[in-house]
């Protein structure tokens, strides 16, 4: 259907966007990880898209990378996971981190993601383990990020006034596998000041 859009960003209200392509405004829903990486209104954007139609409604979803869109599609093939949980996954962790969690079989880390309980996490592991390489080429599990540390850092950033999705993105981007909560918070705040 519609595989990619390139146009001017005319509206931006989480998690919705409107992209003007030759005078036609396309409304898209995007994961928060994509939302916070977008330029300001009035600038050109290039998004990979996924179109869905169910009964009497249609929706268009946008992603900054092909790997995000691939993961979104793979997640929806898992029994019991729809677009809402797929977007929550992409809003919470990067494709690399998610692929590493699947390959490592880390149920506990997956349950930190909003909307994913233990049964859903176990089902994801079973159904996605063989396909992890499909949604991300060159996955490395050695640099596994501790999601408990990231979650705690994100909560602390929220207490400092950051919105939940922005705090999660900041903590995720700042953390490395050897960081403790204080280090992640410090790095996230330093990055925000740049």
Swiss-Prot record:
Region annotation (Flexible linker) ranges: 140-144
UniProt keyword Thylakoid, yes or no: no
Protein source organism: Xylella fastidiosa (strain 9a5c)
Lineage of the species this protein comes from: Bacteria, Pseudomonadati, Pseudomonadota, Gammaproteobacteria, Lysobacterales
A Pfam family the protein falls into: HHH_5
Protein name per the record: Holliday junction branch migration complex subunit RuvA
Gene: ruvA
CDD domains membership: UBA_RuvA_C (cd14332)
Positions of the UniProt region annotated as Domain III: 145-194
InterPro entries for this protein: DNA_helicase_Holl-junc_RuvA_I, Hlx-hairpin-Hlx_DNA-bd_motif, NA-bd_OB-fold, RuvA, RuvA_2-like, RuvA_C, RuvA_C_sf
Annotated spans, Domain II: 65-140
GO BP term, example: DNA recombination
Record's subcellular location: Cytoplasm
NCBIfam families attached to this UniProt entry: ruvA
Family: Belongs to the RuvA family.
Molecular function per GO: ATP binding; four-way junction DNA binding; four-way junction helicase activity
UniProt keyword list: Cytoplasm, DNA damage, DNA recombination, DNA repair, DNA-binding
Function, in words: The RuvA-RuvB-RuvC complex processes Holliday junction (HJ) DNA during genetic recombination and DNA repair, while the RuvA-RuvB complex plays an important role in the rescue of blocked DNA replication forks via replication fork reversal (RFR). RuvA specifically binds to HJ cruciform DNA, conferring on it an open structure. The RuvB hexamer acts as an ATP-dependent pump, pulling dsDNA into and through the RuvAB complex. HJ branch migration allows RuvC to scan DNA until it finds its consensus sequence, where it cleaves and resolves the cruciform DNA.
A Gene Ontology cellular-component term: Holliday junction resolvase complex
Region described as Domain I: 1-64
Comment block on domains: Has three domains with a flexible linker between the domains II and III and assumes an 'L' shape. Domain III is highly mobile and contacts RuvB.
Chief localisation class: cytoplasm
Subunit composition and interactions: Homotetramer. Forms an RuvA(8)-RuvB(12)-Holliday junction (HJ) complex. HJ DNA is sandwiched between 2 RuvA tetramers; dsDNA enters through RuvA and exits via RuvB. An RuvB hexamer assembles on each DNA strand where it exits the tetramer. Each RuvB hexamer is contacted by two RuvA subunits (via domain III) on 2 adjacent RuvB subunits; this complex drives branch migration. In the full resolvosome a probable DNA-RuvA(4)-RuvB(12)-RuvC(2) complex forms which resolves the HJ.
